[in-house]
From Swiss-Prot:
Function: Forms part of the ribosomal stalk, playing a central role in the interaction of the ribosome with GTP-bound translation factors.
GO biological process, alphabetically ordered: translation
UniProt entry keywords in alphabetical sequence: Ribonucleoprotein, Ribosomal protein, RNA-binding, rRNA-binding
Domain of life: Bacteria
Name recorded for this polypeptide: Large ribosomal subunit protein uL10
InterPro entries linked to this entry: Ribosomal_uL10, Ribosomal_uL10-like_sf, Ribosomal_uL10_bac, Ribosomal_uL10_bac_type, Ribosomal_uL10_CS_bac
One annotated Gene Ontology cellular component of this protein: large ribosomal subunit
Family: Belongs to the universal ribosomal protein uL10 family.
Source species of the chain: Rhizorhabdus wittichii (strain DSM 6014 / CCUG 31198 / JCM 15750 / NBRC 105917 / EY 4224 / RW1) (Sphingomonas wittichii)
């Protein structure tokens, strides 16, 4: 890889770090190509990315970003998972690591907050942004539904009263 390619890779990584809300560092201890492809596919489906890059280039790209505190985690064969949704990559990686002992979670960062292994696992247990949005919409819609029911209830009662009078007069 020549200097121009390295500079392009560093610029690409830097833009990735600047546009993400979480970075998770994993150590790949002999993942096969099929396993790595399966992990990348799961990450893509979750809206995240998973990149293997040279540690030195990743360190250079981390300089000046909010994630530069994770420089110390970049030792050995590492890969970086990034996403705008902080929960998505954590869930995928934790689930994948449960079934595959060749993937080791090293840590990560969410903004300026550095996460250890336990922090990444705790992050994976949180609901995703889509789940939170669905809950908020449900909470917002519930009072509106109740208001409509309350407003319609007197009209329904009034209709029943008129129906009873009509039935009484017919009898």
């Amino acid at each position: 890889m020549d200097r121009a390619q390295k500079a392009e890779l560093v610029a690409d990584l830097k833009s990735t770090f600047e546009g993400t809300s979480v970075v998770i560092v994993t150590r790949n201890l002999g993942l096969t190509v099929a396993q790595s492809t399966a992990l990348r596919t799961k990450m893509r489906e979750a809206g995240a990315s998973y990149k293997v890059s040279k540690n030195k280039l990743a360190r250079i790209a981390l300089e000046g970003t909010t994630y530069q505190a994770i420089n110390d985690l970049l030792v050995g064969p590492t890969a970086l998972a990034t996403s705008a949704d902080p929960v998505a990559p954590a869930k995928v990686i934790v689930d994948f690591a449960k079934t595959n002992d060749k993937l080791e979670i090293v840590g990560g960062a969410m903004g300026e907050t550095v996460l250890d292994v336990a922090g990444v696992k705790a992050l994976a247990e949180l609901p995703s942004l889509d789940e939170l949005r669905a809950k908020i919409v449900g909470l917002i819609q519930a009072p509106a539904t109740k208001v409509v029911q309350i407003v319609q209830a007197p009209a329904g009662q009034l209709a029943r009263v008129f129906g009873a009078y009509a039935a009484k007069e017919d009898a």
